Amino acid sequence: VIWSYGNKTIAPYSEQFYVGGANSIRAFTVRSIGPGRFHPAENSTYSYVDETGDIKLEANLEYRFRILSSLFGGNLNGAVFLDAGNVWLMRKDEARPDAEFSFNKFFDSIALGTGLGIRYDLSFLVLRLDWGIALHVPYETGISKYYNIPRFKDGMGIHFAIGYPF
């Protein structure tokens, strides 16, 4: 949680929290989820702004397993993961409805993603490739089920990174 003080009502952008990307909820691009259940309309003022918040809650579960040993001096490992979380605002923002934290909407405002990954471990360097699949987005999509991704291809994220995600 970040709380601005003094005469400021919002924390500096560089200090705000975000979710999504290679080290967060891997089914989504970086800073594309939240805050809360807010989702900018296409071509609106906020459609090109990275989404950040004052509160962050994130959980990651990952099972890693060996695929091949001693492959060109390293080990090839696999991973299956489940990521969940979101960011919220501390104060109500009229320009971004449903962006503030609310216990009543808590479970519906959690983004959920799963996926598979490959890790090449050289013991001094880990290269990884993750393929994330979105299961739930916190905003309204017109689908009333918990799996509310309109099209499968819209709910995928591929990330290449160095090092483990956590």
Regions found by a protein language model. Give the residues of each.
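C-terminal outer-membrane beta-barrel translocator/porin domains of Gram-negative envelope proteins
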Residues: 1-75, 80-105, 140, 144-146, ...
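Transmembrane beta-strand segments that form the barrel wall of outer-membrane beta-barrel proteins
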Residues: 45-47, 129-135
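Transmembrane beta-barrel architecture of outer-membrane proteins
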Residues: 56-60, 111-115, 155-157
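Repeated loop/turn-to-beta-strand initiation elements of outer-membrane beta-barrel proteins
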Residues: 68-71, 120-129
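Conserved active-site loop/cleft motifs that coordinate metal ions or position small ligands
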Residues: 79-81, 126-132
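Strand-loop-strand
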Residues: 94-122
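A carboxyl-terminal module marker
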Residues: 113, 128-130, 153
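Outer-membrane beta-barrel "beta-signal"
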Residues: 122, 152-166
